[in-house]
Amino acid sequence: MNSLLIIAACLALIGTVWAKEGYIVNYHTGCKYECFKLGDNDYCLRECKLRHGKGSGGYCYAFGCWCTHLYEQAVVWPLPKKKCNGK
């Protein structure tokens, strides 16, 4: 019984530690969503939740919206074969 609890705890921890993170990206331009208020940011939190679900979090990091706790298939910046503004 103890072994089962330890295994379940490890699986939960792995899911938490290895959750995907990254900048949300505009699929049309290939650019990150910009923000100017660094740290906790309502705009970034709202955009992350809108695009990636209720479980995600977000804040402004290096003038881009950084999302946390994303599902593995979430698309984040940089997009393959697409540079920001076509550059």
UniProtKB/Swiss-Prot annotation:
InterPro entries, sorted: LCN-type_CS_alpha_beta_dom (IPR044062), Scorpion_toxin-like (IPR003614), Scorpion_toxin-like_sf (IPR036574), Scorpion_toxinL (IPR018218)
Domain of life: Eukaryota
UniProt main location, coarse: secreted
Sequence ranges assigned to domain LCN-type CS-alpha/beta in this UniProt record: 20-85
Signal peptide: 1-19
Family statement drawn from the similarity comment of this UniProt entry: Belongs to the long (4 C-C) scorpion toxin superfamily. Sodium channel inhibitor family. Beta subfamily.
Protein's name in the database: Beta-toxin CsE3
Naturally occurring in which organism (per UniProt): Centruroides sculpturatus (Arizona bark scorpion)
